[in-house]
Regions:
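N-terminal, polar/charged subdomain of small-to-medium soluble alpha/beta proteins
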Residues: 1-118
């Protein structure tokens, strides 16, 4: 069994214009993002995954309009994370707390994963 390193950035906070309703594209809304990557253990610092790069990756995806669906954001971030050197698996969760539905709820959340399962 090969070993791996798990790196998680939990509850990153962004304010973005997201949604398909006309007013959603005008006013930034909060989104929370979790990004976990699994990587081969680094034998030296040059091969380590830098979590600052992971944060910049998430911020870049969320700064690229149009943002209509949580699913698209999650899939795009997953694809970008999996393209990073040394990354062998990734999991992304995107949460939108203010969802226009007829009943109360904490948030809408989309979770996508690719690669290793631990």
């Amino acid at each position: 069994m090969s070993s791996s390193v798990e790196i998680t950035l939990r509850n990153m906070q962004f304010h973005v214009c997201i949604g398909v309703l006309p007013h959603e594209g005008q006013l930034p809304q909060p989104l929370a993002v979790d990004l976990t990557v699994w990587a081969a253990p680094a034998v030296d610092d040059r091969l380590a995954v830098d979590y600052r790069d992971l944060y910049r990756l998430a911020a870049g995806v969320l700064a690229t309009p149009p943002l209509l669906y949580l699913e698209t954001i999650a899939q795009t971030l997953l694809r970008e994370a999996m393209a990073q050197p040394s990354v062998i698996g990734a999991r992304v969760a995107v949460r939108k707390p203010h969802v226009m539905l007829p009943g109360p709820l904490d948030c809408a959340e989309i979770v996508v994963q690719d690669g290793v399962r631990l």
